[in-house]
């Protein structure tokens, strides 16, 4: 599923470091099916809705979504700024409890005096994802759990959370928002 000679190009071979990507072996229809949203008719990707807690705990995003949901439920809502981000006090508190492999809070504090939510990408991503998944919503300058979020917090309802978050992240959100580049429309 690549242009003839593409993989023979020395620049491409150097960039790939000798690895031939699996997608190059796909036919056009197979590649297209993988790019489409999972559904009853498109079974190229199947999202497992009944994972065990041990399997869920392996996902930092799912664990952090549960932490965010619990904090919002336990505190009567998480305080938001006028722009809709979590307040600095909430960000400081959440930085101590979220799981963020490879994220170095000390390094961030070294270059910034104050930390806003967008500065902590693992937290910012999870908050936006939880809102896009309709697990939380804003109400009177607070982030509160929705009925769906409260149901998922019930001990026996964690199973579908990872599938829901994966589905929303890859088929409902614009992940380009997180790349740091503003979209420039042609003039």
Question: What are the language-model segments listed below?
Answer:
Residues 124-126, 133, 137-184:
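Accessory beta->alpha helical hairpin/"wing" motif in late/C-terminal subdomains of nucleic-acid enzymes
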Residues 2-125, 148-151:
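Short, amphipathic alpha-helical interface elements at domain boundaries
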């Amino acid at each position: 599923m690549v242009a003839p000679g593409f993989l023979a190009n020395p620049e491409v071979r150097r960039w790939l470091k000798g690895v031939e990507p699996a997608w190059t072996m796909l036919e056009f229809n197979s590649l297209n099916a993988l790019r489409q949203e999972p559904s009853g008719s498109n079974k190229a990707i199947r999202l497992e809705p009944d994972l065990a807690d041990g399997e869920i705990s392996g996902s930092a995003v799912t664990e952090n979504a549960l932490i965010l949901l619990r904090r919002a439920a336990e505190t009567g809502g998480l305080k938001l700024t006028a722009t809709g981000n979590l307040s600095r006090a909430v960000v400081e508190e959440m930085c101590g409890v979220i799981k963020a492999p490879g994220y170095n809070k000390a390094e961030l504090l070294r270059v910034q005096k104050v930390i806003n939510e967008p500065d902590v990408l693992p937290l910012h991503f999870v908050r936006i994802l939880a809102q896009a998944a309709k697990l939380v919503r804003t109400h009177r300058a607070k982030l509160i759990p929705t009925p769906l979020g409260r149901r998922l917090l019930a001990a026996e309802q964690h199973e579908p959370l990872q599938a829901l978050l994966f589905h929303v992240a890859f088929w409902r959100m614009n992940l380009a928002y997180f790349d740091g580049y503003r979209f420039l429309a042609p003039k």
